[in-house]
Amino acid sequence: MKQGIHPEYKEITATCSCGNIIKTKSTLCENIHIDVCSSCHPFYTGKQKVLDTGGRIDRFKKRFGGRMGRSS
């Protein structure tokens, strides 16, 4: 490797809005604030919900009803 051409690679802390602090390494070289992490993200906590904006799921079920999965 050539000397002097690579960016600095330092340890930083990523602080989540839930209070969790994650130590990692980055070339950013400054501490960052994140909105969600694996401790509070619904996918990882098991509290995942389907958000139906505008009734799209109901509209789909009304339009296609029980036709899905049947072979003609």
Curated annotation (Swiss-Prot):
GO terms for molecular function: metal ion binding; rRNA binding; structural constituent of ribosome. Gene3D superfamilies: Ribosomal protein L31. The keyword NAD does not apply. One of its GO terms (cellular component) is ribosome. Keywords: Metal-binding, Ribonucleoprotein, Ribosomal protein, RNA-binding, rRNA-binding, Zinc. Disulfide bonds: none annotated. GO terms for biological process: translation. Its cofactor is Zn(2+). Binds 1 zinc ion per subunit. It holds the Pfam family Ribosomal_L31. Zn(2+) binds at C16, C18, C37, C40. It comes from the Bacteria. InterPro entries: Ribosomal_bL28/bL31-like_sf, Ribosomal_bL31, Ribosomal_bL31_A, Ribosomal_bL31_sf. Binds the 23S rRNA. NCBIfam families: L31, PRK00019.1, PRK00528.1. Part of the 50S ribosomal subunit. PANTHER family: 50S RIBOSOMAL PROTEIN L31, CHLOROPLASTIC, LARGE RIBOSOMAL SUBUNIT PROTEIN BL31A. Belongs to the bacterial ribosomal protein bL31 family. Type A subfamily. This is Large ribosomal subunit protein bL31.
